[in-house]
């Protein structure tokens, strides 16, 4: 039978109703229920993976404050011409006011594959390692791009994060970086002739790319350092 409201009230000198759970038991029950839900959602085949993404994807987008921009991506005026096969430009999203510096290494006209290489300290970090990464990809016919993700390289900006609840009302640096990766991937996917887009995350940028790929549709491949 249902408890009477008066019997559920607890005042000084009055105990809990018989069988009432303690605060700790309530918390344990909620945790156990969520763990069971996650276990049931754990992917075991392609259909399970699709269901997992459908259920948990909105939560990830909400937690990061990031989304796939699609046709909302805008390309700003090139900050340089095509010099030695390299072009500098900036990307943004319509109505958002963001700016993502991007460097593009040209590929042969017949190229159908593109890769975004994301370093933790900005584009210059990739340039310093061209002999080991960018040039081999170019020789194999890849269109290669890299970005200065939020608060790295030329996109550095001072942020006062001393407020105790800063992340309640503002995106963290890493959340903004995930969005920048998504913006660049979306732009690459819309390049004429490009049929496959892959993603590489170096060092500390690996986790940014792992989070971004969960919100990016149909990437050909993802290689990301995940031990940071």
PLM segments and residue spans:
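Alpha/beta-hydrolase-fold catalytic nucleophile elbow
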Residues: 148, 200, 225-226
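Charged, long alpha-helical assembly modules
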Residues: 117-119
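Alpha/beta-hydrolase-fold serine-hydrolase catalytic core, especially in secreted/extracellular enzymes
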Residues: 1-113, 122-143, 150-153, 158-190, ...
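Gly/Ala-rich beta-loop-alpha elbow adjacent to hydrolase catalytic centers
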Residues: 200-210
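Active-site signature of alpha/beta-hydrolase-fold catalytic machinery across serine-
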Residues: 211-215
């Amino acid at each position: 039978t249902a408890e009477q409201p008066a019997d559920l009230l607890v005042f000084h000198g009055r105990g809990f109703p018989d069988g009432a759970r303690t605060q700790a038991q309530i918390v344990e029950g909620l945790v156990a229920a969520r763990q069971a839900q996650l276990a049931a959602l754990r992917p075991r085949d392609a259909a399970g993976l699709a269901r997992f993404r459908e259920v948990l994807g909105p939560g990830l987008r909400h937690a990061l404050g990031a989304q796939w921009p699609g046709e909302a991506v805008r390309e700003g005026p090139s900050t340089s011409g095509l010099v030695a096969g390299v072009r500098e430009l900036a990307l943004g999203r319509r109505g958002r006011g963001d700016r993502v510096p991007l460097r593009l290494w040209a590929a042969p006209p017949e190229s159908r594959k593109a890769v975004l290489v994301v370093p933790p300290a900005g584009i210059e970090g990739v340039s310093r390692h061209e002999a080991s990464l960018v040039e081999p990809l170019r020789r194999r016919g890849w269109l290669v791009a890299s970005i200065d993700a939020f608060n790295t390289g030329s996109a550095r900006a001072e942020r006062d994060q001393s407020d105790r609840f800063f992340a309640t009302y503002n995106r963290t640096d890493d959340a903004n970086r995930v969005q920048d990766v998504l913006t660049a991937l979306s732009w690459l996917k819309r390049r004429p002739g490009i049929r496959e887009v892959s993603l590489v995350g170096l060092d500390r940028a690996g986790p940014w790319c792992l989070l971004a790929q969960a919100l990016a549709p149909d990437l050909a491949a993802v290689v990301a350092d995940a031990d940071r």
